[in-house]
Amino acid sequence: MFELTKRIDSNTQDAVFDTLTLPYELRIRGRLKAVTDNGHDVGLFLDRGPVLRNGDLLRASSGEVFSISAADEPVTTAYIENGLPLARLCYHLGNRHVSLAIGVDADGRHWIRFPPDHVLEELAILLGAQLTHHQAPFDPESGAYAHAGREQSHAHSHEHSHADGHTHAH
């Protein structure tokens, strides 16, 4: 088994030995056992930290370089007009603390992608989005504080309320 222990810069001159294709729920973990695209057994032994992104590179303790690929998985893609409609949909979905991927397709249509969820889908339709259910890589936004160190993290707490009248603190 190859022990993948180090994240490396994507500008490395080393050849990629193999690719590890994982869905989002596994790319957030620092410890797991998996099988690469070419059938090699690997174990991830990474410090907690950033999510593994499509194209990230990892080095095995024996020196080989492995590329990470985001697996196709069930997603809902909400297509919506740019500008205020897009901002409004991002705001309302983000207020529900759901992971979101945001992008533009080859035809210039703006989209928001999230794991299938009938409540979120109803909200997106209510706000003017057209939905597509399909298989695609899910690589959500990392969040505003994802690159901050421990000392710089979003450490203060705050409260907010929702339309149904309940509140909670963070």
Swiss-Prot record:
<dbReference type="Pfam" id="PF05194">
    <property type="entry name" value="UreE_C"/>
</dbReference>
<protein>
    <recommendedName>
        <fullName>Urease accessory protein UreE</fullName>
    </recommendedName>
</protein>
<keyword id="KW-0963">Cytoplasm</keyword>
<comment type="function">
    <text>Involved in urease metallocenter assembly. Binds nickel. Probably functions as a nickel donor during metallocenter assembly.</text>
</comment>
<dbReference type="GO" id="GO:0019627">
    <property type="term" value="P:urea metabolic process"/>
</dbReference>
<keyword id="KW-0143">Chaperone</keyword>
<dbReference type="InterPro" id="IPR036118">
    <property type="entry name" value="UreE_N_sf"/>
</dbReference>
<dbReference type="GO" id="GO:0065003">
    <property type="term" value="P:protein-containing complex assembly"/>
</dbReference>
<dbReference type="GO" id="GO:0005737">
    <property type="term" value="C:cytoplasm"/>
</dbReference>
<dbReference type="GO" id="GO:0051082">
    <property type="term" value="F:unfolded protein binding"/>
</dbReference>
<keyword id="KW-0533">Nickel</keyword>
<feature type="region of interest" description="Disordered">
    <location>
        <begin position="137"/>
        <end position="170"/>
    </location>
</feature>
<dbReference type="InterPro" id="IPR007864">
    <property type="entry name" value="UreE_C_dom"/>
</dbReference>
<dbReference type="GO" id="GO:0016151">
    <property type="term" value="F:nickel cation binding"/>
</dbReference>
<feature type="compositionally biased region" description="Basic and acidic residues">
    <location>
        <begin position="148"/>
        <end position="170"/>
    </location>
</feature>
<dbReference type="InterPro" id="IPR012406">
    <property type="entry name" value="UreE"/>
</dbReference>
<keyword id="KW-0996">Nickel insertion</keyword>
<comment type="similarity">
    <text>Belongs to the UreE family.</text>
</comment>
<dbReference type="GO" id="GO:0006457">
    <property type="term" value="P:protein folding"/>
</dbReference>
<dbReference type="Pfam" id="PF02814">
    <property type="entry name" value="UreE_N"/>
</dbReference>
<dbReference type="InterPro" id="IPR004029">
    <property type="entry name" value="UreE_N"/>
</dbReference>
